[in-house]
Every structure is written in structure tokens, then in C-alpha cells.
């Protein structure tokens, strides 16, 4: 059993997932959009949230032409239930429900700044102390296919005690191939750091591809790699930080 589970760790988005940041075409003052996806596994920042099991996810977003946006994300999870079982008690906490909002604006040609807030909510997680619910503020900048993002928690981070002020930084590139514009190469490198809990820090990298099937459908896969210390991320023999191939299909509407 992982020792960090005593502190209720949850860590670990690539391409499509819970990270805030709306991507949709502005065709009017107000734009509503959504995305439904099926993943072979829900991993977040390199760490499995579903104990290597599939996940069904939904994003709903609103954006105004001023740059303001707000949205929500829902996914099934297993890490809280597995943590409870590993520690001898029962939990029905099998849902993650996030709410995010912010403001995007252009500062130069092809350069966009994104500033916002993200709240991670875990309904039915009342048995866990400290609470896994987490608040983060973030700032990002994108130029063409490249994007840099920094996030910092304003609360304890995913239940880790005394971890307010933890940080996450990532650099991602999503590059459509000129010869095959429907095929996008995705690459990411990031680092998660836990305030006052440095033994949990790790780096994650991901490389993969997404193919646009048309009519809002996309399929893709990527390989994720972390250097997280296995002893802190293993529950009942399952290493949540294990290097794995993840596949997905999504529908945007």
C-alpha cells in the first residue's frame, strides 16, 4: 500500500482532459460548446485516476467574444474508492466534477494569454481527511502550436497535508502535419511540485497523435512517462505512476 495514500494524494492532462482552457471558434458574442470522450484510462498529470480502467468524460463550455470563459468537466474516477479500500473503510466517491473560468486575450499576432481559476470537486468524499477538493489559479501563454502553462494551488493539493502553494508547469506542442493536416502530433513535458512534500515531486512527458475523423470526431493515443517515486504512488500493488499507452475517442459539439 502506498504511504502517501495516508495523505490522500491525487495528482497528475494532455490533449483533452480536465485542464481549463476553452478551444472553440467564436461565431457570435456567445459560444456554447462541449466534448464527450472515452479514454482507455483517465490519467491526470501523469498519474492514473481510474486505476488503469476506462473513463467516460464530459466538458461543457461557454465563451464570450470578450475573452471570458467558464466551463465544467466530469469524469469517473477510482482513486478515492481504492484508497478507502486500502485503508480499511468504504467510500462511494467515484466522480470528479471540476469548474473553471478565466479570461483569454491576444497580446500580439498568434500570441494568446490565458488567466483563470480551476476548482476540483470530489462529491461523496466526506470520509477523507484532509479533503481532496482543490483550488488552483493558472496563467498560460500560447504561440502558434506551442503553449506554456503555470498553475499554483490556493488550498491543500488533492488532500496532501500542508501543500497549499504547490505548483505545476507544463510546455506542450500540438503540431498539425502539413502533409496530413488531419493528423496532429502532440508532445508535452511538465513538472508537478508539492509544497512542503518534495518527496512527491515528479516530471512527466507525453508523446502521441490525434486524428480528425470529421463531424466532430477525433481518435488518438499517446504514451506517458513519469519519474515519480513508485513507493508513494502504489495502492494495493497498482502503480498509478506507471508508464503507459493511453487511447481515446472524442466527439465535439
Predicted segments with their positions:
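Cleavable N-terminal export/targeting peptides
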Residues: 1-31
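Transmembrane beta-strands of outer-membrane beta-barrel pores
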Residues: 38-44, 64, 74-78, 105, ...
Amino acid at each position: 500500500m502506498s504511504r502517501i495514500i495516508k495523505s490522500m494524494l491525487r495528482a497528475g492532462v494532455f490533449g483533452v482532459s480536465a485542464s481549463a482552457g476553452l478551444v472553440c471558434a467564436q461565431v457570435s458574442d456567445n459560444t456554447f460548446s462541449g466534448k464527450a470522450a472515452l479514454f482507455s484510462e483517465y490519467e491526470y498529470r501523469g498519474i492514473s485516476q481510474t486505476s488503469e480502467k476506462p473513463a467516460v468524460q464530459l466538458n461543457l463550455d461557454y465563451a464570450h467574444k470578450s475573452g471570458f470563459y467558464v466551463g465544467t468537466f466530469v469524469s469517473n474516477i477510482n482513486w478515492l474508492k481504492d484508497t478507502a479500500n486500502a485503508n480499511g473503510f468504504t467510500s462511494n466517491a467515484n466522480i470528479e466534477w471540476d469548474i473553471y473560468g478565466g479570461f483569454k486575450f491576444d497580446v500580439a499576432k498568434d500570441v494568446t494569454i490565458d488567466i483563470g481559476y480551476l476548482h476540483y470537486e470530489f462529491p461523496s468524499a466526506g470520509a477523507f481527511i484532509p479533503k481532496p477538493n482543490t483550488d488552483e489559479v493558472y496563467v498560460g501563454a500560447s504561440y502558434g502550436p506551442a503553449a506554456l502553462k503555470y498553475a499554483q494551488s490556493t488550498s491543500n493539493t488533492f488532500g496532501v497535508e500542508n501543500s497549499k502553494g504547490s505548483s505545476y508547469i507544463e510546455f506542450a506542442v500540438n503540431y498539425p502535419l502539413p502533409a496530413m493536416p488531419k493528423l496532429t502530433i502532440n508532445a508535452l513535458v511538465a513538472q508537478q511540485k508539492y509544497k512542503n512534500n518534495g518527496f512527491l515531486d515528479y516530471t512527466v512527458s507525453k508523446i502521441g497523435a490525434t486524428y480528425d475523423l470529421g463531424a466532430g470526431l477525433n481518435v488518438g493515443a499517446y504514451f506517458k512517462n513519469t519519474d515519480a517515486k513508485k513507493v508513494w504512488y502504489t495502492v494495493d500493488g497498482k502503480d498509478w505512476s506507471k508508464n503507459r499507452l493511453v487511447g481515446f475517442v472524442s466527439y465535439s459539439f
